[in-house]
Regions:
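Phosphate-handling DNA/RNA-contact segment within nucleic-acid enzymes
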Residues: 1-16, 22-26
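TOPRIM fold recognition
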Residues: 13, 27-31, 36, 40-110
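Helix N-cap/beta->alpha junction signal
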Residues: 21-22, 60
């Protein structure tokens, strides 16, 4: 499990990560991962280097899914060539036995 967690965290650290809100930002910062919020992205405040991978990391609930869909649609229409990834965030949640981004730090920080 540790190796898979390390791999996922490495991927996230080397990409652009979008989360739902400020609490998620705080959790990811404690893990050394820089993020942008859903709100910032939807206001057009995200700059993505060409060819970068954008990880969409939302809670595993209806609202998180709706926000992930909105961000995916917005970024697909407004950015140049980039790769959107929603699966890595879900893998992280599953690996940490979490349903929200706020919950992932507990198993990782142990």
């Amino acid at each position: 499990m540790r190796e898979r967690l390390s791999t996922i965290l490495f991927e996230l650290k080397n990409g652009v990560v979008v989360v739902e809100g400020k609490h998620d930002v705080a959790v990811m910062e404690r893990l050394g991962i820089c993020t942008s919020t859903y709100e910032r992205v939807m206001r057009g405040g995200l700059t993505v280097p060409e060819g970068a991978k954008v990880f969409i990391l939302t809670d595993d609930d209806r609202r998180g899914s709706e926000k992930a869909d909105a961000v995916s649609g917005f970024l697909s229409g407004s950015l140049g060539p980039c790769r959107l990834d929603r699966e890595t965030g879900l893998r992280l949640l599953n690996l940490c036995n979490a349903t929200s981004v706020e919950q992932v730090s507990k198993p990782i920080e142990k």
